[in-house]
Curated annotation (Swiss-Prot):
Its main location: mitochondrion. This is Pentatricopeptide repeat-containing protein At1g51965, mitochondrial. InterPro entries: Pentatricopeptide_rpt (IPR002885), TPR-like_helical_dom_sf (IPR011990). It is found in: Mitochondrion. The lineage of its organism: Eukaryota, Viridiplantae, Streptophyta, Embryophyta, Tracheophyta. Residues 1-23 form a transit peptide. The keyword Mitochondrion applies. Keywords: Mitochondrion, Repeat, Transit peptide. PANTHER family: PENTATRICOPEPTIDE REPEAT-CONTAINING PROTEIN GUN1, CHLOROPLASTIC, PPR_LONG DOMAIN-CONTAINING PROTEIN. One of its GO terms (biological process) is RNA splicing.
């Protein structure tokens, strides 16, 4: 029987040898006849269909097998179970994966970590994968595109395993590595691999290497690679050229590269010219930049908004107002819409060259592109630069727009009018803003209140405050604080107290600034005792006085020659951890000097120096008076110079 089996398998081998397959497969034979003695038999074997192959004879990947393997790996909850199921599945079919199929499975896995684990398993599933560079290329590419924090170390580990296993990569391996690594050391390692694997760099390899050096900002090596590309007769695409030009923007070498593009018949696009225009501007060659612009037009190219802005930035740097306006006019003619940055370049140029009167012409040129947003930007910018009349004129143009206005532009105009002292215009504007669909808010009212208070226009404050309470919006804590300070500034103490009491009855509650304003109002108008009462009141309400509170009240006591009270407040603020500033020391020094307490004033000055405060001009004025007293010099006492030392809380 053993002999029969041996003869049977020998006959099977004889039958199948001409079409031997490279993959382990089970064969089923059907016995068709046997000898009477049973010592020989005939069997019929049905060979499986051969694997489909491409035109070169390489087997095509079996898609159903790839999908099944991918589903087994990704569908399992446990990784070890997934790989075990895959191994069992392949064993049940007596199949092995081809390297291409393993590569496709790697590509189908959506997790880089899962791909790495499968890559480790591939040698046991695919006997011919050990020396396949394409499989290594696939896993390196997957890692290079991942966000794994240790992806660089993982790729280096794979390269080490390739070296140890004597696996030679191909030029695609090097290209992937160059595109992945970013530092010079790793790039040098890639070049060593080229020599080790006896590879020849192609145009794409040189392009990858050039871009890698540019990304790592190693511009000298990048230019060396470019020179090698020229010597080798390799070609670069427009993207690589533009990237190199942008990197060499501050270098004369950019001009050489630009000329090489023409010699090598690489068509220069609008981005190329934009880069070169910026380069000429950086090295101060404005005329050459204009020449490039004209050359670009001759070649039928059109700049986009970035290109036009770049050219106008160069012209602004060269103070070429006429040329900048000409370029702006052409920009509009070609249908390129200017943006805020375009207008900012022209506006700053006109302001710097004292030709702001030409702004109306610029606006007229781009009339069809003027929007509410552009008007708003110009109004805000002119207001910040202090050109109130021009801002107001543009604002009037903006007012004619039928669309809803922007709050920021109206706010900027209000601030400009108030800053220029045009409070009547500001009040009128405040009353008409709602016509443009902009709701007047508390900040707008506060801006106008603050300007009226500084100009002591109390009658307008009364009227506007009544209108605010009647029509809205509701006053906030800042409104009340501004009003208290404004009434105190003109000596209307009763009105300031009324506002403070109204604040207490409102939803807003007085804060430290409210009390500081009221204390300053009371003290400066002679009611020091009431100011002191308010000081105690704020402490009872849980508000901690700050340095402004103490300084204000100390100044009030100093003016009424109540030195002990002033000094007591100074000691109290130190105990409570409130650090005095230079204004506090100046007030107390002046108080002590005026009352002849020279020794205490000198001691106080020493404390001030120990605290690390720097004396100012007022400090030195008081010290000069102290020195003149110590030398017995007679002098005429001038008007109290301390008035106004304490800055308004607002």
């Amino acid at each position: 029987m053993k002999l029969l089996r041996r003869r049977f398998f020998n006959s099977v081998n004889t039958i199948t040898r001409p079409n031997r397959r490279h993959y382990a497969t089970k064969y089923v034979a059907k016995v068709t006849s046997s000898s009477p003695s049973g010592r020989s038999l005939s069997a019929e074997v049905s060979l499986p269909n051969p694997l489909p192959a491409d035109v070169r004879g390489y087997p095509l990947p079996r898609r159903h097998l790839i999908c099944r393997a991918t589903n087994l790996i990704t569908g399992a909850s446990n990784l070890s179970d997934a790989f075990s199921d895959l191994s069992d599945y392949l064993s049940s079919l007596s199949l092995s994966l081809t390297p291409d199929e393993a590569s496709e499975i790697l590509k189908s896995l959506n997790s880089p970590l899962l791909a790495v684990e499968f890559f480790k398993l591939v040698p046991s599933l695919c006997p011919y994968s050990q020396n396949d560079p394409f499989l290594y290329n696939r896993i390196i590419l997957i890692l290079s595109r991942s966000n794994l924090p240790d992806r660089f170390d993982r790729v280096r580990s794979i390269l080490d395993s390739m070296v140890k296993s004597n696996v030679h990569g191909n030029i695609s391996t090097v290209n992937i590595l160059i595109g992945f690594f970013g530092n010079t050391e790793d790039l040098q390692m890639c070049l060593r691999l080229v020599k080790k694997w006896d590879l020849k760099m192609n145009s794409f390899t040189y392009k990858c290497l050039l871009q890698a050096y540019l990304r790592s900002r190693d511009y000298s090596k990048a230019f060396d690679v470019y020179c090698e590309i020229r010597r080798g007769g390799h070609k670069l695409d427009i993207f690589a050229y533009n990237m190199l030009l942008d990197a060499l923007a501050k270098d004369e070498k950019a001009c050489q590269v630009f000329e090489d593009m023409k010699k090598r018949h690489c068509r220069r696009d609008e981005y190329t010219y934009t880069i070169m225009i910026r380069t000429m501007g950086r090295i101060g060659k404005c005329d050459e930049a204009v020449g490039l612009f004209n050359e670009m037009i001759t070649e039928g190219l059109t700049l986009n908004v970035v290109g036009y802005n770049t050219l106008m930035q160069v012209l602004a740097k060269g103070k070429m107002v006429d040329k900048a306006i000409q370029v702006f006019s052409r920009m509009v003619e070609t249908g390129c819409r200017p943006n805020e940055y375009t207008y900012s370049l022209l506006l700053n140029l006109l302001v710097a060259e004292g030709q702001l009167v030409r702004l109306d012409g610029v606006v007229e040129i781009s009339k069809r592109y003027m929007t509410q947003g552009i008007y708003s930007y110009l109004v805000r910018t002119l207001s910040k630069l202090g050109h109130v009349s021009e801002a107001h004129r543009l604002f009037c143009d903006m007012w004619s727009f039928p669309v809803k206005g922007e709050r920021d532009s109206y706010m900027s105009m209000l601030e400009s009018l108030c800053g220029a002292g045009k409070t009547i215009e500001a009040i009128e504007m405040l009353s008409k803003i709602h016509e443009k669909g902009v709701v007047t808010d508390t900040m707008m009212y506060n801006t106008v209140f603050s300007a009226l208070g500084k100009l002591k226009q109390i009658s307008h404050i009364h009227d506007l405050f009544e209108k605010m309470k009647k029509d809205g919006p509701s006053p906030d804590i800042f409104t009340y604080n501004i009003l208290i300070a404004s009434f105190g500034r003109v000596g209307e103490v009763d009105e300031a107290i009324n506002i403070f009491e109204e604040l207490e009855r409102s939803d807003c509650k007085p804060d430290i600034i409210s009390y500081n304003s009221l204390i300053n109002c009371l003290g400066k108008n002679g009611d020091v005792d009431e100011a002191h009462v308010r000081f105690k009141e704020m402490q009872e309400k849980g508000l901690n006085p700050d340095v402004v509170t103490y300084s204000t009240l100390m100044e009030c006591f100093g003016k009424t020659e109540r030195v002990e009270m002033a000094y007591s407040l100074f000691e109290e603020m130190l105990v409570k951890g409130c650090q005095p500033n230079i204004v506090t020391y100046n007030i107390l020094l002046d108080c002590l000097e005026k009352n002849g307490r020279t020794a205490e004033a000198v001691d106080l000055y020493s404390k001030m120096k120990q605290q690390g405060l720097t004396p100012d001009s007022i400090t030195y004025t008081v010290l000069e008076r102290l020195q003149s007293v110590s030398h017995g010099k007679s002098r005429i006492r001038r008007k109290n110079p301390i008035t106004g030392w304490v800055v308004s809380p607002l």
